[in-house]
Amino acid sequence: MSDFRVPFGPSETEFTEKRSRFIGHLLPVETEEQAREFIAQMKKKYYDARHNCWCYLIGGDTMRYGDDGEPQGTAGQPMLNVFQRENVTNVVCVVTRYFGGILLGAGGLTRAYSKSARDALVAAGVSEMRLWAMADIPCPYALFERVRGEVTALGGTVDSADYGADIRLTVSLPAENTAALRERLTELSAGGIALTVTAEAYRPGPKVEI
């Protein structure tokens, strides 16, 4: 899975369209169980509403939605489309509608549910998830500062250093930069320093406004 975005936090938004109230709730989640639990909570909280439409996306290939009594294709799917267009996953969104007595039509419903989902996403903000690599680097004392400088120059950090006959560094950096770091270390040490990637994991970045 390539880099992607997740909600920075939960949010709640509301607007009125032709006397119908649309209340949007968004929550970052990591599993379908968490998503379903949140949907159930919202349905319980807004038990007296006409509709509690929902969608969720988990990872790169798990997505579900529900129209909860609205005409097919006018609620859950348009909500889902909002997050897909923004490359956002690990999210559940529930839009509650209190009917105001005026029919909105299929087009009006689609626009209203899309707006509610997007409003909730804008309110939450997003975080860029980037694949990072963790690596070990055995480093002679004489080259420590230069090696640390190369790691930093490529957007990485030195997480720990064990001192013995040489210095064994544990570093983290964007996975896409590991090849460049390996090349720089080879040049720096005439092939004497070998970088070993020990793990990879996605990490969130700072909040980004939509």
Language model region names:
Residues 157-162, 189-206:
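Conserved short beta-strand edge segments in small beta-sheet-based binding/regulatory domains
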Residues 1-73, 196-210:
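C-terminal regulatory domains involved in ligand/effector binding and gene-expression control
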Residues 138-156:
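Short amphipathic alpha-helix segments
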Residues 147-152, 180-189:
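Short amphipathic alpha-helices in soluble, non-transmembrane regions
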Residues 25, 53-54, 90-93, 134, ...:
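Structural motif
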Residues 125-143, 169-171:
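Short glycine-/aliphatic-rich beta-strand segments at the starts of folded cytosolic domains
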Residues 171-180:
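Terminal, non-globular segments
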Residues 79-124:
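Active-site beta-strand/loop microenvironment that shapes enzyme catalytic pockets
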